């Protein structure tokens, strides 16, 4: 079980690909290792299913908590459903792999990547993507690879290849680039308002490293004596005759529909459906032994698929040769835009409605307390999430009916992209300590709903009074490539996404890019073409941003009356235990007395949440009193809180008490404490002593009462005593 290992070094870090040792019954397998991170990737192919018209590819990413030396916290102590992070990595594998399989393939394909060991310095996702390509090649599956992926970070002015988790958090860029020998096939990025030139340079930097990993895969195949299987479409004479028949009988009528630029999407779809129905009737009237009729009768979907292929061809020709899109727009023109803020009652903390053409997204923003942060129950060692973006895509948004189920991979992916786009402009936690949740409801979809979610989120957050550093907008770019002819499309709609070769989403502020996501339907593009798309997206983004700012030009200065009020301040971390008290009694008493919610971080940051600002301030005074250091000799005016036979307790600061011994109540002898003071009395005391246990001993002797002497500390606002 020795296997074969190929190693490659990047910036002093070695990546190892081991084949022929693990999972011998899988079609192909490879162990990808870097540092102490190890990911086993397998690819398996089984017999195709009858009657399907798509590639049945499944990509899974599995996390095992033993990889980080942990035991699951569930009742069964076993991993449950994949966490969101695993879903996103599965999509990261799928997106560059899917376009590299032949369009005619109908065999079931499954790629499974399992993280067996995780080094916090080496993220596992890009290893899994590269491993998917290697395993597929070893399985002798028709595949237009090799393909590889790397991550690029930016620390200061230097690009870093495959940075650690900490370097990603500290840097201004988190970019994943996947490519083939033909060019870049996938890009995923989050950036801190980075200039376009820097992002393009990073993509070029990453693609150079991708080429090295591609060579390593080719070397493994050569050393193992495995010849890569080249995709060769099966010859189906009947389908060829059907294509010829449709081209002869339908091209003119389809072309006329595509040139009716003023029609709506529904009208265009209806006319195309009518042409297809009429064609089906004509085919049904042909002789029974006619090859075209036999082809359609043999497979109910073959007519629909060939009709779509012809429509795609004609639409692409119209764009390439005439520069005309199906709705009459120029190649760089954005659809009509409308936006509004505050469209829902203020019980919703913030709301925004964004519409571009037929794409309409309603976003809402909710402000929560630090305890609402999401704990990440996965292998990723990152902190709690304090900004959440959830994306919903109901069936009515495309005029369809289907059961409403929990969010799928697409919803998770689109929500993550919109989340990435907004995070760089969120206010610092110490000045705005709220946990934020944005939900984007897609009310109507005709292309680029994820970028519509970004725009709607900006409107909702500004309406909620979140002081964003800058507003963010986004646009989706498309591409049509026919041989050497390339046309880049701005703000693609649904049919252009479906029939085009690229879906490139670009989000950012007027100063720079915050998120990118590029998916291809071809085997790769040169970086130069990607740069053209990024540059063409900027005027569109700025135009969209200007339209959004017409609805709300700055964050609101007040929060919704139904949003919680937060106070945040810092205390000495060594005094956290004083605030919490034995068994949590002190902090529980403060929250019950003031009707507030209090969170304390390990670093000493205290956050108080309440719907009543005065109550939050009262809780703050108590905590500041508990943590304020007092000194012997200081004079305070306080309230008698309780009396015992040997003395009286005085609250000298909110939450901080000292005791006056009976002998310190007066210069004369005192028989009973309540002969001198009673509960509720206001007295001026001096700190006589602080013992080695921190107990404060007070005295009334020699201390003028009734404000006859200047106090070293102003009298605190009276509050009820702690239990």
From Swiss-Prot:
The biological processes this protein is annotated with in GO are: mRNA catabolic process; RNA processing
Question: Hey, what's the signal peptide range on this chain?
Answer: none
GO cellular component terms, alphabetically, are: cytosol
Segments of this protein annotated with the region Disordered: 701-723
Q: Where does Mg(2+) bind?
A: 497, 503
Q: What does this protein need as cofactor?
A: Mg(2+)
* CDD domains the UniProt entry points to: KH-I_PNPase, RNase_PH_PNPase_1, RNase_PH_PNPase_2
- Plastid as a keyword? no
**Which residue numbers delimit the S1 motif domain?**
633-701
Localization annotation: Cytoplasm
Q: Which family does it belong to?
A: Belongs to the polyribonucleotide nucleotidyltransferase family.
Protein name as annotated: Polyribonucleotide nucleotidyltransferase
From which lineage does this chain's organism come?
Bacteria, Bacillati, Cyanobacteriota, Cyanophyceae, Synechococcales
């Amino acid at each position: 079980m020795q296997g074969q290992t190929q190693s490659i070094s990047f910036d002093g870090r070695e990546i190892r690909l081991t084949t022929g040792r693990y999972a011998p019954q899988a079609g192909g397998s490879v162990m990808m290792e870097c540092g102490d991170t190890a990911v086993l990737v397998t690819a398996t192919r089984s017999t195709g299913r009858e009657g399907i018209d798509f590639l049945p590819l499944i990509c899974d990413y599995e996390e095992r908590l033993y990889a980080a030396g942990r035991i699951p916290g569930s009742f069964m102590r076993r991993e449950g459903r994949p966490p969101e992070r695993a879903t996103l990595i599965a999509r990261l594998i799928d997106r560059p792999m899917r376009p590299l399989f032949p369009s005619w393939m109908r065999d079931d394909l499954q790629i499974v990547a399992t993280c067996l060991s995780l080094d916090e310095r080496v993220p596992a996702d890009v290893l899994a993507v590269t491993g998917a390509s290697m395993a597929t090649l070893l399985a002798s599956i028709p595949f237009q690879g090799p393909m590889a992926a790397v991550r690029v970070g930016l620390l200061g002015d230097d690009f870093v290849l495959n940075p650690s988790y900490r370097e990603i958090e500290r840097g201004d860029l988190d970019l994943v680039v996947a490519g083939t020998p033909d060019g870049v096939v996938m890009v995923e990025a989050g950036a801190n308002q980075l200039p376009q030139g820097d992002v393009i340079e990073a993509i070029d930097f990453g693609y150079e490293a991708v080429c090295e990993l591609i060579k390593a895969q080719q070397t493994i195949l050569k050393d193992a004596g495995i010849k890569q299987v080249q995709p060769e479409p099966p010859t189906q004479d009947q389908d060829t005759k059907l294509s010829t028949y449709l081209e002869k009988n339908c091209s003119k009528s389809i072309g006329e529909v595509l040139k009716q630029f003023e029609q709506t999407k529904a009208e265009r779809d209806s006319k195309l459906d009518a042409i297809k129905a009429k064609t089906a009737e004509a085919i049904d009237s042909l002789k029974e032994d006619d090859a075209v009729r036999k082809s359609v009768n043999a497979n109910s979907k073959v007519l629909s698929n060939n009709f779509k292929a012809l429509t795609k061809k004609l639409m692409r020709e119209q764009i390439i040769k005439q520069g005309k899109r199906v709705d009459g727009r120029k190649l760089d023109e954005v659809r009509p835009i409308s936006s509004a803020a505050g469209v829902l009652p203020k019980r919703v903390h913030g709301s925004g409605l964004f519409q571009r053409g037929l794409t309409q997204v309603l976003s809402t923003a909710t402000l929560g307390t630090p305890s609402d942060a999401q704990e990440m129950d996965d292998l990723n060692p990152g902190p709690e999430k304090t900004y959440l973006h959830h994306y919903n895509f109901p069936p009515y948004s495309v005029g369809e009916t289907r059961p409403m189920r929990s969010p799928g991979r697409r919803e998770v992916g689109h929500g993550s992209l919109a989340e990435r786009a907004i995070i760089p402009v969120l206010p610092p936690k110490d000045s705005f300590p709220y946990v934020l949740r944005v939900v984007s409801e897609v009310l109507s979809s005709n292309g680029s709903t994820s970028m519509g979610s970004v725009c709607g989120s900006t409107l909702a957050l500004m309406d909620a009074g979140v002081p964003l550093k800058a507003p963010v907008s986004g646009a989706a770019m498309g591409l049509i490539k026919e041989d050497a002819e390339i046309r880049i499309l701005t703000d693609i709609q649904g049919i252009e996404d479906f029939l085009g070769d690229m879906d490139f989403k670009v989000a950012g502020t007027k100063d720079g890019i915050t998120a990118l996501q590029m998916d291809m339907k071809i085997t790769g593009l040169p970086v130069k073409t990607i740069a053209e798309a990024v540059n063409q997206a900027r005027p569109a983004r700025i135009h969209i941003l200007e339209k959004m700012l017409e609805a709300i030009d700055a964050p609101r200065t007040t929060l919704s009356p139904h949003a919680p009020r937060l106070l945040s301040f810092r205390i000495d971390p060594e005094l956290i235990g004083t605030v919490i008290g034995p068994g949590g009694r002190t902090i529980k008493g403060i929250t019950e007395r003031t009707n507030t919610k209090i969170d304390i971080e390990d670093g000493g940051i205290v956050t108080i949440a309440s719907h009543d600002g005065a109550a939050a301030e009262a809780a703050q005074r108590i905590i500041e009193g508990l943590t304020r250091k007092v000194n012997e000799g200081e004079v305070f005016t306080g309230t008698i809180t309780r009396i015992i036979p040997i003395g009286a307790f005085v609250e000298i600061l909110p939450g901080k008490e000292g005791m006056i011994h009976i002998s310190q109540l007066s210069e004369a002898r005192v028989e009973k404490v309540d002969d001198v003071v009673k509960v509720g009395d206001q007295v001026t005391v001096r700190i006589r002593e602080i013992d080695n246990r921190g107990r404060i001993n007070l005295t009334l002797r020699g201390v003028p009462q009734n404000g006859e002497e200047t106090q070293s500390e102003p009298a605190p606002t009276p509050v009820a005593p702690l239990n």
